[in-house]
Amino acid sequence: MKKVFCLLVVFCSFLLCSCDVPQGMRELLAYQGGDFACEAVLSGEKPIALTISRVGDEIIIKPEGMEHIGDAAFVFDEEGAWICSGKTRIKLEKTQLQRLCTVYEMFTLDSAKAWRITEEKPGGIEIYKCESDGNTVYIDANTLLPLRFSAGGEELDVKKFEMAE
């Protein structure tokens, strides 16, 4: 009986060691370290299509329909927050600003925090579901690219994600 148990323990150890599972969140969040371009939809009462990119240290979030504004800047004053370019000023509602900040946070997740990583297969697609401090990121197990984010009551579905060369 002891031999069977020992054999079973050795076999299980072999299976665990041979699994192709990433080292941890540092590897799973590696896409955050380089330049990328992403198309996503922020769900909610009013879904917003977004283009999100990283160039160097900057993360640029452009809502669909804002292309005509060109080089825009966020301006904060006593009346609130605005997106401005030249003479064009568009007031951002508090909820819109909070939603954009949540999107930014989704692309600057901290791999050093304690994460709970589980493997799932919804619809036959292998993914890693990673949860920490109210943030959840779903990562494709084959490409190690993000598929969906959830944070602060917001859901961001990634439609397209490309790493820069």
Predicted regions and their residues:
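N-terminal leader/targeting segments and the immediate start of mature chains
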Residues: F14-E58, M66-H68, T88-T95, D110, ...
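Flexible, processing/modification-adjacent segments and terminal tails
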Residues: Q23-A37, W82-G134
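Short, hydrophobic/proline-enriched secondary-structure or compact coil segments at domain edges
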Residues: A37-E39, G80-A81, L145-A151
